[in-house]
UniProtKB/Swiss-Prot annotation:
GO terms for biological process: mitochondrial electron transport, cytochrome c to oxygen. It is a multi-pass membrane protein. It is an enzyme of class 7 (translocase). The chain crosses the membrane at residues 16-34, 41-66, 73-105, 129-152, 156-183, 191-223, 233-256. This is Cytochrome c oxidase subunit 3. The lineage of its organism: Eukaryota, Metazoa, Chordata, Craniata, Vertebrata. SUPFAM superfamilies: Cytochrome c oxidase subunit III-like (SSF81452). It is found in: Mitochondrion inner membrane. It catalyses: 4 Fe(II)-[cytochrome c] + O2 + 8 H(+)(in) = 4 Fe(III)-[cytochrome c] + 2 H2O + 4 H(+)(out). Component of the cytochrome c oxidase (complex IV, CIV), a multisubunit enzyme composed of 14 subunits. The complex is composed of a catalytic core of 3 subunits MT-CO1, MT-CO2 and MT-CO3, encoded in the mitochondrial DNA, and 11 supernumerary subunits COX4I, COX5A, COX5B, COX6A, COX6B, COX6C, COX7A, COX7B, COX7C, COX8 and NDUFA4, which are encoded in the nuclear genome. The gene is MT-CO3. Pfam families: COX3. Residues 35-40, 106-128, 184-190, 257-261 are mitochondrial intermembrane.
């Protein structure tokens, strides 16, 4: 075995970026097939490959960090920069949706009846389910912070309790959002209002599901004693992502649900 004269982790060749890219292609192509031809086989295949890719890629990262000790302080620092850049790109992603919403709502066209919400659209009451969803997500932000501080203090029981509670709140949010979609009086095809509403809130809902999955992985790792009070970047990244999801929801609630109604 050769001596390593630097603190960085040189990864071995991995198939997971290729399978992940293949899954992304199948999912986007499958979405088109689902929308236009009512066929969901391709998107389901893409989701299956993506799930298998995530499972095995996470397994490899856990193996490299927890059991082989490759995640040195320098590597962890680079992972932090990577997560910050990723969240920045996500902020810009949602900026596009807010831009589309405000572009359409601040100067509604004649086709919309020169009013916002457009003629024939009955918006959702912002003080019913959306307000409950806001309270649920804000509460989950408190519980994930509780879990983080408990982990840093070495309080394992409270870390597990708080993390479990956060996952339950995230799942509850997803259920409420799904119920809201089924009960809405308009669809994604109902003018620019329906398009901006369902695309913006739908992508946020997808991010909540991704964040919940992230937290479930962290819970499983915590149960297996993978995290210590000083070495837990996987959990830290999940907490950052969850706070990002919280903040985006506040902007969505104030813009689309409250002001936009």
């Amino acid at each position: 075995m050769t001596n390593q004269l630097h603190p960085f982790h040189m990864t071995n060749p991995s198939p997971w970026p290729l399978t992940g890219a293949t899954a992304a292609l199948l999912m986007t192509s499958g979405l088109i097939m689902w929308f236009h031809y009512n066929s969901s086989q391709l998107i389901m295949l893409g989701l299956l490959i993506m799930l298998l890719t995530l499972t095995q890629w996470w397994r490899d990262i856990v193996r490299e960090s927890t059991f082989q000790g490759h995640h040195t302080p320098s590597v962890q620092n680079n992972l932090r920069y990577g997560m910050i850049l990723f969240i920045t790109s996500e902020i810009l992603f949602f900026t596009g949706f807010f831009w589309a919403f405000y572009h359409s709502s601040l100067s509604p066209t004649a086709e919309l009846g020169n009013i916002w919400p457009p003629t024939g659209i009955t918006p959702l009451n912002p003080f019913e389910v959306p307000l409950l969803n806001t309270a649920v997500l804000l509460a989950s932000g408190v519980t994930i912070t509780w879990a983080h501080h408990s982990l840093m203090e070495g309080n394992r029981p409270q870390t597990l309790q708080a993390l479990t509670l956060t996952i339950i709140l995230g799942t509850y949010f997803t259920i409420l959002q799904a119920m809201e979609y089924f009960e809405a009086s308009f669809t994604i095809a109902d003018s620019i209002y329906g398009s901006t509403f369902f695309v913006a809130t739908g992508f946020h809902g997808l991010h909540v599901i991704i964040g919940s999955t992230f937290l479930i992985v962290c819970l499983m790792r915590q149960l297996k004693y993978h995290f210590t009070s000083h070495h837990h970047f996987g959990f830290e990244a999940a907490a950052w992502y969850w706070h990002f999801v919280d903040v985006i929801w506040l902007f969505l609630y104030l813009s689309i649900y409250w002001w936009g109604s």
